[in-house]
């Protein structure tokens, strides 16, 4: 089973994402960007759903760090900010794609499937 790391500090958002994905994927959790970096080093997930605004280290900084040791992993930025400038910042940090919250379950599954098959 493919592994997805959900880097999300808000419990309700994590639970929603987990419910959407747990049938088809093994779900890992990070509460902040620093944890996401460490889990990525150890667990080697196939894809990361990266919240942008998190404590300790934000999602953009975590993405930049992850890209220093893993250029292949798929990283999808998740944020409540749906501005074009936020999307551009996510891509510049190294994210493969971007989705505004609240996420639509079918759209998220489709996006993940396009990367993981």
Where would I find each of the regions flagged by the language model?
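C-terminal output helix
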Residues: 103-112
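Receiver (REC) domain active-site loop signature in two-component systems and cognate sites
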Residues: 54
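Active-site beta3 strand of CheY-like receiver
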Residues: 43-49
